[in-house]
């Protein structure tokens, strides 16, 4: 079936094992996924240090734009609509960066609830403060064009979540990726 082929592709892509399933009768399709694993070197989300730099592994905001397209809250041409809805349904999780990040990150978290919400979880749990420069927060060229053309606020798009980029801090003297 198409579902089992897709699950097989994801297992190969992310080097995971699908160990079983839970079958229930329903007239709707439903999935529940539980992930269990082991880690030798854990980067916790509450170990930021004073004067750490803040990093983001990739662009923010595309997923939220995709959600707005799906909810018919914003109209875009067909090509851009497909681009953004794909980002919403299939975020590009950068697993290949994780080994590099854990070499020097003091703390990290995935951006699932939005940049500001997840940064607050990571930093404010330690009663630290932070300063962000909006111009330095990465967004795609597609999103930049739309924000400029429609005169929309960047902060609204980077703060809504579902981007699944890695947000992390590292000391200034650490080597960068």
Q: PLM features: what roles do these ranges have?
A:
Residues 1-177:
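Helix-biased detector of long, well-ordered alpha-helical tracts
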């Amino acid at each position: 079936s198409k579902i089992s082929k897709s699950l097989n592709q994801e297992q190969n892509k992310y080097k995971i094992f699908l160990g079983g399933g839970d079958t229930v009768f329903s007239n709707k399709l439903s999935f529940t996924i539980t992930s269990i694993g082991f880690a030798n070197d854990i980067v916790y989300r509450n170990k930021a240090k004073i004067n750490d730099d803040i990093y983001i592994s990739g662009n923010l905001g595309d997923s939220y734009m995709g959600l707005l397209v799906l909810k018919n809250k914003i109209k875009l041409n067909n090509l851009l609509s497909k681009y953004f809805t794909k980002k919403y349904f299939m975020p590009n999780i950068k697993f290949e960066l994780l080994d590099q990040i854990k070499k020097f990150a003091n703390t990290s978290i995935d951006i699932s609830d939005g940049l500001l919400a997840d940064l607050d979880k990571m930093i404010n749990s330690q009663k630290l403060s932070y300063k962000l420069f909006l111009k330095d927060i990465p967004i795609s060229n597609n999103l930049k064009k739309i924000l400029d053309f429609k005169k929309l606020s960047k902060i609204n798009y980077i703060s809504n979540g579902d981007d699944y980029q890695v947000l992390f801090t590292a000391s200034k003297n650490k080597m960068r990726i």
